[in-house]
């Protein structure tokens, strides 16, 4: 059984239409995808295709809906880029930064670090994306645990687009 709904290089991801990608998500999903789930995936696909455009020539991977068996949850997006692991949790339509959502994305990063062999010696940057949030944290601060996990960043979707180019 696959541990994610979609996994490809950044280049391959950018070459597919949002409709084709959504079709793959639905086909790979084990269960009935509700309309709200499909809409969230469509939003995440659109956002990530915009965000990753400047990185199209990079040797990176993008993974959607990665299973975290210990929690019985899925990380919305795992991005492997330039030796870093970015763990993104989207809250589509949300305007606010909730502490419970920050804790959720940090838990995902901790689970990757502690229970995924290939992540153990990598730097992990958790990012919470309440899509309608109007501000952004941009200070990269290592956690107090000296475990190569950074404190979660929080940004609205529109501010992900304004990240510096490679």
Roles of regions detected by a PLM:
Residues 127-160:
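Short, low-complexity, polybasic intrinsically disordered segments
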Residues 161-166:
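Conserved small/polar residues in nucleotide/adenosyl-binding loops
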Residues 1-134:
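Nucleic acid-processing catalytic cores of prokaryotic defense/repair systems
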């Amino acid at each position: 059984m696959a541990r994610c709904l979609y996994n490809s290089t950044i280049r391959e991801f950018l070459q597919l239409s949002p409709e084709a990608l959504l079709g793959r998500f639905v086909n790979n999903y084990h269960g009935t995808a509700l309309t709200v789930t499909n809409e969230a995936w469509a939003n995440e696909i659109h956002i990530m295709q915009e965000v990753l455009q400047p990185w199209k020539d990079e040797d990176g991977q993008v993974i959607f809906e990665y299973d975290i068996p210990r929690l019985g949850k899925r990380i919305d997006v795992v991005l492997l880029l330039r030796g870093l692991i970015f763990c993104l949790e989207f809250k589509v339509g949300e305007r606010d930064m909730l502490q419970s959502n920050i804790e959720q994305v940090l838990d995902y990063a901790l689970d990757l670090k502690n229970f995924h062999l290939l992540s153990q010696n990598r730097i992990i940057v958790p990012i919470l994306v309440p899509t309608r949030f109007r501000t952004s944290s941009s200070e990269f601060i290592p956690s107090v645990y000296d475990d190569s996990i950074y404190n979660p960043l929080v940004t609205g979707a529109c501010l992900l687009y304004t990240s510096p180019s490679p």
